[in-house]
Amino acid sequence: MVGRKSYGMDILFKIIEINKKTNTAVLKGLEMRLIADAKLDDLVFPDAKTVQRYRKQSEEAQKECIRKIYRRRSLEREQLRSVSGRAPEEFFEMPGKILHLDGDPEYLEECLKAYQSLQLDVVGEFVPEKEQPVQVWHLLHQHRPDILILTGHDAYIKNEKNDFQSLKYYRNSRYFVEAVQKARKYEPGKDDLVIFAGACQSHYEALLAAGANFASSPQRVMIHALDPVFLVEKVAFTSINESVNIFELIKHTITGLDGVGGLETRGKFRLGLPKSPY
């Protein structure tokens, strides 16, 4: 576990590759969906207290997002009781089905735990970013989801032109763009298949132009590994008769408006009556 001196140890990383010829390392964010290169002499090993504090802050942010979600759901069920005159226990719920493609198996595992705690219907697949455009069509046919997530790692590559528009200055955005385009050939309707695409510092505008409903990263900032989960939860639990409140949706993420954004989109939640006793 390391941090970068030049960035004030703002993010902690794992070293995933070392190039002894160039004295550089490839780093993966512990909590952020970022892949970065760094000089070996810029790396610092944090002490145990720093690591503990970093992990605690991240865990608290995650727990707060989950608490907000459950408070919102509780309020929505009470509203249902007052409108229908029936107890929420008489209904059954069918949130939208999610297909989550992730370029990192560790992040995927953490996301699946979060989905489970939020009682979401999800299929998770580890698919490297380069392979997502190749595999997305087959996986969509196989699983028939209501919501698709395309994520993993990404990074903006600094350049002399300070060019934020060319996809060549992003590590993986072009693969996410291609995958979104393939998914839109499978299902063109943005309300029929809801798509979130991107990771840290991804090309937000290009992803939306390709057909994503939601994407990262408007301000080219880092996003948390669980941000896609918290974002699509709101879509999965918003009625098919309503548009998702974008401000409410983004409020439930860890990163907020700087990291994720998107378009007005209809929800994927269906309510059923009566609930079977069996």
Give residue ranges: language-model regions:
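Intrinsically disordered, low-complexity, charged/polar segments
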Residues: 32-80
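C-terminal functional extensions of proteins
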Residues: 219-278
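Short beta-strand-centered aromatic/proline hotspots
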Residues: 9-19
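Catalytic cores of nucleophile-dependent amide-cleaving enzymes
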Residues: 176-223
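Proline-aspartate-enriched helix->loop->beta-strand connector
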Residues: 140-153, 212
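Short helix-loop-beta junction
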Residues: 112-123
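Conserved acidic segment of CheY-like receiver
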Residues: 96-105
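SH3/SH3-like beta-barrel fold
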Residues: 15, 24-34, 38
